[in-house]
Amino acid sequence: MNNAAKNIKAFEDIRSLHKKYGDIVRVGPRELSINRPSAISVIYEPPTRTTRSPWYAQVSNDVTKISLNSTRVLKVHKLRKKVWERGLSFRALAVYAPRIQAKVDLLLSKIANHCGRPIDMTEYAMFFGFDVMGDIGFSKDFHMLELESEHLAIKGVHESMLAIGVLGTVPWLLSMISKVPGAAASFSRFTTWCHRELQKKREDQDPRDIISWLLKALSEGDPSAPPGEIAIQEDARLLIIAGSDTTSAALSNALYYLASNPNSYQRLQAAIKEEFPGGINDWTYDKNIPYLDYVIQETLRLKPSVPGGLPRVTPPQGLMIDDDFIPGDTVIAVPTYTVQRDARFWSDADAFKPERWENLSTEKSPWIPFTRGQWACPGRNLAMMELRMALSHIALRYSMSFAHADASKIFDNGVMDTFTLTLPPLHLIFTPL
């Protein structure tokens, strides 16, 4: 916790420890960080015998009072995840796509208003991410892009993230502080907003957004529904936070790497223009543009939106990772940022090279930004849709560069680990093509 409080860069601290001490590093009284690709399948993929660690129990261990993400019992998680998968299915995404497109168009209009002048794309990517999730999550618009300002409820979320970065290594302390009157005042603005909007959504049982799928399941007595009133309130909060900050960070980071690597950006533009020779008016989502996906995958390799390892607990009998025995009841994790930048597993590991993915598979490489197995992020396809839409539209319309000589360094050095990445301003200048 001392290191976390100093610089809020736990992902870099963990990487440094592995460079110094090797593949297996003790990072807590009974906690190990394991920097090996072979550990990924053992820890995260079926038929793993690990379970989620106590870190996930910061709210409660009672499954009727927690979100899907806090659920530690595999059978319960597997059941509850089914309704989320309905709300995030390809069929559902087809319904959401025009609404996401509308937010992309609004984002592009704001970029147009700043043409030739610096614009903080960290801020506008955040506006975009939360506006999208407000719409497809609740059919509610935060109007952040329109007003070019942060909604008060969302500001409360971001004011609370610093505590997670510092205290998240001691989950019981974070839980204790959250119960001190006034200590969680900022976050309470967000919880109040979610509760109010959830009550409004109960009047609408037509699944036009993600939360209505959960409410429909609850009203119909579906076993996959959130198991109680508190559980669905927690799911509502999870929906907005998990679906917004992660995608926003990925979009900002992709723009950072493309501005830093003009040749990669030009290749992306050429790949998109080849599919849409008539420009933006020809654009459709159904075109397969491999290099666009390579850019996204490479961005998530170098700067995963959740950079730390996702902790699991070994079964009582322990388990083997290669030739190493890990005792039972030990918290273990593969450090995402570290394993995705290890030179043993990646050539020119710290370089942005989207073309490396021409001969690589996301499932066979040590690439885990969405994690693996039953606990994997159910929103992966939604995130990819948002990123493909936003990046392809920007590439079709604009060239871009950093606003000043130090903009790149300021952005790269200012990243903080608050479970998800908290990013500094990214000042870019866009020029119409």
Label for each model-derived stretch:
Residues 3-15, 196, 279-322:
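Conserved cytochrome P450 K-helix E-x-x-R motif and the immediately C-terminal K′/meander segment
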Residues 268, 299, 329, 352, ...:
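Hydrophobic, well-ordered secondary-structure elements that form the walls
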Residues 418-433:
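C-terminal helix/juxtamembrane-tail motif
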Residues 1-79, 94, 99-110, 128, ...:
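N-terminal membrane-proximal hinge/A-helix region immediately C-terminal to the signal-anchor transmembrane segment
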Residues 262-264, 363, 375, 380-418:
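Cytochrome P450 heme-binding "Cys pocket" and the immediately downstream C-terminal segment
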Residues 246-259, 390:
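Short, small-residue alpha-helix embedded
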Residues 334-360:
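Conserved cytochrome P450 K-helix/beta-meander segment immediately N-terminal to the heme-binding cysteine loop
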Residues 52-61, 95-251:
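Cytochrome P450 heme-thiolate monooxygenase catalytic core
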